[in-house]
Amino acid sequence: MSTKKVYSFLSQAFIFSAIMLVSNIIATHLPIPMPSSVIGLVILFSLLCLKVIKLEQVESLGTALTGIIGFLFVPSGISVINSLGVMGQYFVQILTVIVVATIILLAVTGLFAQFILGKDDKEIEDTKELKVVNKGRKHGKVA
């Protein structure tokens, strides 16, 4: 029988609200503009990794919010539509920034992936070489 504890909607909402309150306070005191939602995600991720908050404590509300995420983006979409006049004036600049940022993002992601994969391949090769050397020593052969 499962002993998984079910947390109430209210307790989960309190956890999310407390994290958002703290992230709003942090965002107002930072010297650079940073969205409080990003700070909140970092705080939530950190608390989950450090096991201060258990996944069960926020899982069902998180799943519910993920289910309605499209609805949550409606206000952002409306504000973009309201800004089409401004965006039309700077279309070339906006398009240039989007294309350049996308290329930089792809390049950095690719280089980082190659670095990580190359590091793993080198560790595998080093491990294989070490096994061959150790195997030779067992049989009285020195490499």
Swiss-Prot record:
BP-aspect Gene Ontology terms: cytolysis; killing of cells of another organism; programmed cell death
Transmembrane regions listed in the UniProt entry: 6-26, 30-50, 61-81, 97-117
GO annotation, cellular component aspect: plasma membrane
Pfam families membership: LrgA
Membrane topology recorded in Swiss-Prot or TrEMBL: Multi-pass membrane protein
Keywords assigned: Cell membrane, Cytolysis, Membrane, Transmembrane, Transmembrane helix
Family statement: Belongs to the CidA/LrgA family. LrgA subfamily.
PANTHER family linked to this entry: ANTIHOLIN-LIKE PROTEIN LRGA, HOLIN-LIKE PROTEIN CIDA-RELATED
NCBIfam families on file: PRK04125.1 (NF003155)
Biological function: Inhibits the expression or activity of extracellular murein hydrolases by interacting, possibly with LrgB, with the holin-like protein CidA. The LrgAB and CidA proteins may affect the proton motive force of the membrane. May be involved in programmed cell death (PCD), possibly triggering PCD in response to antibiotics and environmental stresses.
Protein's name in the database: Antiholin-like protein LrgA
Species for this entry: Bacillus mycoides (strain KBAB4)
Gene assigned in the entry: lrgA
